[in-house]
Curated annotation (Swiss-Prot):
Keywords: Cytoplasm, Membrane, Methylation, Mitochondrion, Mitochondrion outer membrane, Transmembrane, Transmembrane beta strand. It is found in: Mitochondrion outer membrane; Cytoplasm; Mitochondrion. Its main location: mitochondrion. It comes from Mus musculus (Mouse). It comes from the Eukaryota. Plays a crucial role in the maintenance of the structure of mitochondrial cristae and the proper assembly of the mitochondrial respiratory chain complexes. Required for the assembly of TOMM40 into the TOM complex. This is Sorting and assembly machinery component 50 homolog. One of its GO terms (biological process) is protein insertion into mitochondrial outer membrane. It is a multi-pass membrane protein. PANTHER family: SORTING AND ASSEMBLY MACHINERY COMPONENT 50 HOMOLOG, SORTING AND ASSEMBLY MACHINERY SAMM50 PROTEIN FAMILY MEMBER. Associates with the mitochondrial contact site and cristae organizing system (MICOS) complex, composed of at least MICOS10/MIC10, CHCHD3/MIC19, CHCHD6/MIC25, APOOL/MIC27, IMMT/MIC60, APOO/MIC23/MIC26 and QIL1/MIC13. This complex was also known under the names MINOS or MitOS complex. The MICOS complex associates with mitochondrial outer membrane proteins SAMM50, MTX1 and MTX2 (together described as components of the mitochondrial outer membrane sorting assembly machinery (SAM) complex) and DNAJC11, mitochondrial inner membrane protein TMEM11 and with HSPA9. Belongs to the SAM50/omp85 family.
Length: 469
């Protein structure tokens, strides 16, 4: 009887019977006789059985939820497409090292003339895995060591221990992750961690020891995360020359907060998008679940990307946020917003805009920042179609402001203060995209609207990170 083998299926064509688009990894062998081929290609088929080879500690219910759509396929192309989608879902669980798909005509006494069997050949991950890699944060690099216990209880649970040593931050943490069967985006996690960070722009050292629990879920076209966090914070001076304003912030505090984040992301890439939009909103309420820190904090991020002629992209972004202390106690330097640097308002030093004391930047309780960008291919297109596609020429205009507000005044007074003393800059440079990990920028910046106390970077400025204004 005719058989069809399809292993590691690549994305399939949206319609038609052009099997040549499947790539090298999909093969068709022994398709005979022609009458059977006609049945498979041009008539309805029925998926009678789905088999799994290679399962060990994985429970049946977690995988049944991922392959249910395969049974709904009505023709061969749809069977292959849905099998490929099921394969991607199985790999996304993070419990298999390899998943291959075999599609064959059905055998046995109950076999229908147009019946098919689909077999998933899987290789489970080992019970304990380790990793070593480097990560790029916002103008910071770090080395990361990790140990992971995948599929701990057989339903895609995961326990992870991670140690990170960076240029400004050292951390280690233990986390437990549990997805909902059949809906990987709906998951629950618990984290224990300790983070020690150095913030030279504020002459501040901070050590956080905490626990958090969060629940993530999709809702229509949005993604939501609800989180509780309890953290013991220890603030200290980074140097003997720290200002008095920083010294009086030193000591211990306990923060217990509830937060919510909503994300709508239609971009084709999070690092250097060519099209799509991002809208992100975060809310945090501290003090009502314990601790000695009380505030309401809100911030948002908006980004729009539009492709233009000649392989160019126009991008615009807007950030903003506000922190309102609750009660008579002022806000902490650890909770305020910071602005400036190669990843936000370019042309200014890292976090060196706004309120400061004796050269130490104290952050602000309200801010906004916006940017206009034009990304074009490199002149004369060197390396076109290859390595040169990772580079883009970059023209930008940034602006923003960071300040403290008098909450006894009305909204008009707040807007007026945020509109005063606007810092802005413009320039041009080159952007390098490092896959989907990070991006590097080398820009020539001309800062404008500089205020007293601001620290500028007039000329060439280098930036590395994953989130840019």
């Amino acid at each position: 009887m005719g058989t069809v083998h399809a292993r590691s299926l690549e994305p399939l064509p949206s319609s038609g019977t052009d099997f040549g688009a499947l790539g090298e990894e999909a093969e068709f062998v022994e398709v005979e006789p022609e009458a059977k081929q006609e049945i498979l290609e041009n008539k309805d088929v029925v998926v009678q059985h789905v088999h799994f080879d290679g399962l060990g500690r994985t429970k049946d219910d977690i995988i049944i939820c991922e392959i249910g759509e395969v049974f709904k396929a009505k023709n061969l192309i749809e069977v292959m497409r849905r099998s490929h989608e099921a394969r991607e879902k199985l790999l996304r669980l993070g419990i298999f090292r390899q998943v291959d798909v075999l599609i064959d005509t059905c055998h046995g006494e109950d076999a229908l003339p147009n019946g098919l069997d689909v077999t998933f050949e899987v290789t489970e991950l080992r019970r304990l895995t380790g990793s070593y890699n480097t990560m790029v944060g916002n103008n910071e690099g770090s080395m990361v060591l990790g140990l992971k216990l995948p599929n701990l209880l057989g339903r895609a649970e995961k326990v992870t221990f991670q140690f990170s040593y960076g240029t400004k931050e050292t951390s280690y943490g233990l986390s437990f992750f549990k997805p909902q069967p059949g809906n990987f985006e709906r998951n629950f996690s618990v984290n224990l961690y300790k983070v020690t960070g150095q913030f030279p722009w504020s002459s501040l050292r901070e050590t956080d020891r905490g626990v958090s629990a969060e629940y993530s879920f999709p809702l229509w076209k949005t993604s939501h995360t609800v989180k509780w966090e309890g953290v013991w914070r220890e603030l200290g001076c980074l140097s003997r020359t720290a200002s008095f304003a920083v010294r009086k912030e030193s000591g211990h505090s306990l923060k217990s907060s509830l937060s919510h984040a909503m994300v709508i992301d239609s971009r084709n890439s999070s690092i250097l998008p060519r099209r799509g939009a991002l809208f992100k909103v975060n809310q945090e309420l501290a003090g009502y679940t314990g601790g000695d820190v009380s505030f309401i904090k809100e911030d948002f991020e908006l980004q729009l990307n539009k492709p233009l002629a000649l392989d160019s992209v126009f991008s615009t972004s807007l950030w903003g946020g506000m922190l309102v202390p609750i009660g008579d106690k002022p806000s902490s330097i650890a909770d305020r917003f910071y602005l400036g640097g190669p990843t936000s308002v370019r042309g200014f030093s890292m976090h060196s805009i706004g309120p400061q004391s004796e050269g130490d930047y104290l952050g602000g309780e309200a801010y906004w920042a916006g940017g206009l960008h034009l990304y074009t291919p490199l002149p004369f297109r060197p390396g076109q179609g290859g390595f040169g596609e990772l580079f883009r020429t970059h023209f930008f205009l940034n602006a923003g402001n960071l300040c403290n507000l008098n909450y006894g005044e009305g909204p008009k007074a707040h807007i007026r203060k945020l509109a005063e003393c606007i810092r802005w800059s413009y320039g041009a440079g080159v952007v390098l995209r490092l896959g989907n990990i990070a991006r590097l920028e080398l820009n020539y910046c001309i800062p404008m609207g500089v205020q007293g106390g601001d620290r500028i970077c007039d000329g060439v400025q280098f930036g590395a990170g994953i989130r840019f204004l």
